[in-house]
UniProtKB/Swiss-Prot annotation:
Isopentenyl diphosphate binds at residues 48, 84, 134, 233-235, 278. Dimethylallyl diphosphate binds at residues 48, 84, 134, 233-235, 278. Keywords: 4Fe-4S, Iron, Iron-sulfur, Isoprene biosynthesis, Metal-binding, Oxidoreductase. Disulfide bonds: none annotated. It is an enzyme of class 1 (oxidoreductase). One of its GO terms (biological process) is terpenoid biosynthetic process. InterPro entries: LytB/IspH. [4Fe-4S] cluster binds at residues 19, 106, 205. This is 4-hydroxy-3-methylbut-2-enyl diphosphate reductase.
Amino acid sequence: MTQHRPPLEIRLCGPRGFCAGVDRAIQIVVLALKKYGAPVYVRHEIVHNRYVVEGLQARGAIFVEELDEIPAAHRNQPVVFSAHGVPKSVPADAEAKNLFYLDATCPLVSKVHKQAMRHQRLGRHVILIGHSGHPEVIGTMGQLPDGAVTLIETVEDAHTCHFDDEDNLGFVTQTTLSVDDTAGIIKELQARFPNLAAPAAESICYATTNRQDAVRAAAPGCDLFLIVGAPNSSNSKRLVEVAEKAGARMSMLVQRAEDIEWEQIGDISVVGLSAGASAPEIIVDEIIDAFKARFDVKIELAETTVETENFLVNREIRDVELTVKDMAFVNGEHRVVGISKLMQGK
């Protein structure tokens, strides 16, 4: 006799998962391995996702935290800088060591770097809204001399900070912050420093905003909201917070289906599901399959917008063909993001 499975609605958010910057960064490592052979070194996790990192390691990537960890015998092999960006000192160190490097910094993070440098060029002290210790924050602060940037993490920081010249200030933000929380910090800073200069363009990236909007729209009425992402993924953790604030009874961050605590979930009838910008779609599929094994699942697409952005890879590797098979370890065999457009503009 077939076991009865209770009904379950899964609200599958769209957009979700990989953004254009993450796609580009992973593809840079894949293409470098195809062109130059293993090993390809990567400074820091290329993106904050264990599954992605392990998949690239299996293909010949070696992850290091500092360039000094690269053996002398492999100094002729390429090193890739992560999507989060690096301080100016890192490429300078690579050049001093005669290393060939490929910079996989997200173009939107690079834009924040340029905005910060523009503030300084115009004589402003730079305020960076972000989380201390995050690689993106370290990279942005490292674009300017010591003392040229002040990090603000909370509204309380914004309320208590002081500057020598309060009329010459400019701010930028980490790209992966909560839109709502950042708005509160900016409001407090603007109230205290009326001449505070904003960046020429929004610092929080389109993908962060889009994923938060989709979760916010889907969360009301959800018994549980699952976000696929790593514990060190800033944008994924923000999605958990957004789901809770928007009305989900419970929200969880999981890296794989095996992380779901079924006993803790209890009785549920509506589940929201999304993924951080560094989480692969193949894990979303895995989690849906885990629910299908326990419930009679009906999937409702909770889509708020459609993303079409694509970023070109580095010129040095545009002559290498990227195939569906190359990216199947993160996208699955049925889904490829950006490959057809990636190679345009050679």
